[in-house]
């Protein structure tokens, strides 16, 4: 933020808000970069800058775990039931993200290739399915990512595939949410490794969709906001292909007792911080804020904002 010429303009705009919320890391980052140059003061979560009082608090958004369980449970559609039967002896790594450069899909493919390279004992016994529906198809950069993934999927399958075994399935299409929850439930590993993500609710949905008696394992990027809450996931650096590959191997070989323990810890957090709690807590705190007597005005321009060296 400090590298932006308009840093102080943005800071002033944010400070006009009475209650600033999001993730703990973002709240801390905002104050770290703003405080030295704003001439502002703060005590605990209460702050004062340019004569305006405001508060920072952390409200990580949640999901509806009960609804996820309902969608994930019950009989499978005929085609999915048939697929599950065909793959009963195969461990499934599953991932679903919109086609976006921030999701780290090329890096994810490279990490899976590293798994096949360093842990050949899994050959013929695992399958990685990546669903990535098209996003902003008219933008050239997104077209390039799509073509890159198609090329990488073909190359990896050509290098490691066998008769009767295709190691990587890449699907560039939309799937119904209810169907995805059912796929989550029978997946052995959920791979969620964005390069940067404010929260990533897919990680929480994967955990909520699992069978508590035989849950899958979540491999999660340290740069996803959800990693602050889901600390019992296997947390990885998505830029380190070998680290992600090692985590995938750990997930595929993890004993049932450890899987149950990790899942229970994450599910407890998800249920405690569900969408209803998120909404109620934020609204309650917002109502507790004392209204300002004077109307807040946005800065007219950024001419007073000095450039940073």
Labelled PLM ranges:
Residues 1-309:
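Catalytic cores of carbohydrate-active enzymes across secretory and cytosolic contexts
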């Amino acid at each position: 933020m400090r590298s932006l010429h308009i840093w102080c303009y943005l800071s002033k705009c944010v400070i006009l808000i009475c209650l600033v919320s999001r993730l703990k890391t973002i709240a801390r980052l905002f104050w770290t970069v703003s405080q030295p140059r704003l001439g502002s003061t703060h005590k605990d979560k209460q702050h004062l800058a340019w004569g305006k009082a405001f508060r920072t608090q952390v409200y990580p958004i949640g999901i509806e775990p009960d609804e996820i369980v309902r969608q994930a449970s019950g009989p499978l559609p005929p085609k999915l039931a048939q697929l599950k039967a065909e793959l009963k002896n195969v461990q499934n790594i599953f991932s679903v993200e919109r086609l976006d450069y921030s999701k780290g899909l090329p890096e994810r493919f490279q990490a899976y290739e590293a798994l096949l390279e360093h842990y050949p004992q899994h050959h013929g016994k695992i399958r990685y399915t990546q669903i990535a529906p098209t996003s902003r198809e008219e933008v050239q950069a997104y077209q390039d990512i799509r073509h890159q993934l198609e090329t990488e999927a073909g190359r990896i399958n050509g290098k490691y595939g066998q008769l009767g075994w295709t190691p990587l399935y890449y699907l560039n299409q939309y799937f119904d949410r209810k169907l995805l929850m059912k796929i989550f439930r029978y997946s052995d590993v959920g791979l969620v490794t964005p390069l940067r993500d404010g929260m990533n609710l897919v990680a929480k949905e994967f955990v909520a969709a699992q069978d508590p008696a035989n849950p899958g394992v979540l491999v999660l990027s340290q740069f996803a906001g959800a990693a602050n809450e889901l600390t019992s996931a296997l947390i990885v650096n998505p830029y380190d292909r070998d680290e992600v590959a090692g985590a995938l191997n750990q997930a595929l070989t993890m004993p049932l007792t450890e899987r149950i323990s990790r899942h229970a810890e994450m599910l407890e957090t998800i249920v405690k911080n569900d969408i209803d709690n998120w909404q109620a807590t934020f609204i309650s705190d917002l109502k507790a804020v004392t209204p300002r007597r004077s109307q807040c005005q946005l800065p007219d321009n950024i001419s007073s904002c000095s450039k940073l060296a």
